[in-house]
Swiss-Prot record:
Protein name: Methionyl-tRNA formyltransferase
Any one GO cellular component localisation term in the record: cytosol
Record flagged with keyword Protein biosynthesis: yes
One GO MF term attached to the UniProt entry: methionyl-tRNA formyltransferase activity
Origin species: Chromohalobacter salexigens (strain ATCC BAA-138 / DSM 3043 / CIP 106854 / NCIMB 13768 / 1H11)
Reaction equations catalysed: L-methionyl-tRNA(fMet) + (6R)-10-formyltetrahydrofolate = N-formyl-L-methionyl-tRNA(fMet) + (6S)-5,6,7,8-tetrahydrofolate + H(+)
Enzyme nomenclature, EC number: 2.1.2.9
Gene that specifies this protein: fmt
Amino acid sequence: MSHSLRVVFAGTPDFAAASLLALLDSRHQVVAAYTQPDRPAGRGRKLTPSPVKALAQEHGLPVHQPTSLKDTDAQQTLAALEADVLVVVAYGLILPQAVLDIPRLGCLNVHASLLPRWRGAAPIQRAIEAGDTRSGVTIMQMDAGLDTGAMLLVRETPITATTTGGELHDRLAPLGGEAIVEALDALATDGLTATPQPSEGVTYAAKLSKAEAELDFTRPAHELAARVRAFNPWPVAWTRLAGEPLRLWLAEAEAEAERPGVAPGTLLQSAPDALRIACGHDGTQVVRITRAQLPGGKPLAVRDLLNARGERFPEGLRLGQEDRA
């Protein structure tokens, strides 16, 4: 029969909180939580605790918020907790080798991709953006590299032609929680084998930036649609409509048909429920935008947007231009 492990948890955002919640509901004993220092948030820029801190405090856990784990005092504080294992999920601090060596069973990481594909900061969004048809979570034994440790457990989930970054995040977060509990249960009975990551198929998921969210309509329709879905809910894909930002929340590639090319970014005759935009290097492909947001407005289904503000979207207008019409 498996026994309970002493766990220290390190994580920061909502994605990490899902794993902490699963651990709190498991047979294992979470003895402390590590998370990023409180950050200013909201319009008032009020110091706000991370989702992991809020959850830990609800359950009466001691919370540690060091700015670094590289100094010996911080490492001694961690060592004094006498953890069997440190579980790390989207923590945001680099763990030096001295920290990785502290727990008896080392440090386990919940990573939101099928490693070795999409090591790095934004695996959920990059998988959708690249047109991947599957994603998942990998439980990894951490080493000093960037998401390079041996794999202990992998759980998959499909990516469909309509999956957004937010939807995949919300599916993977609880899946990560289930997987880390399963991994700890197995570790407690010596029933888990570490598999080195293959050297083939390594890709890196660069951190998202607002700068890359502006669409380039010379790109193919399937690529634009994937980018729109990947960047929902952040940083949100956008273009310029008569010089003003038009945010694009949902999109799909239109089935290719023989049609004359026009300048990429040109608004074509609208469908009742979609903005049809010419794209591709020769303007012969079409990307359909089905949910969008005008400045000062809220995201709307394009059907509702056209009913309310159809005059803003005349056929022939070219999107992505700096100048106002």
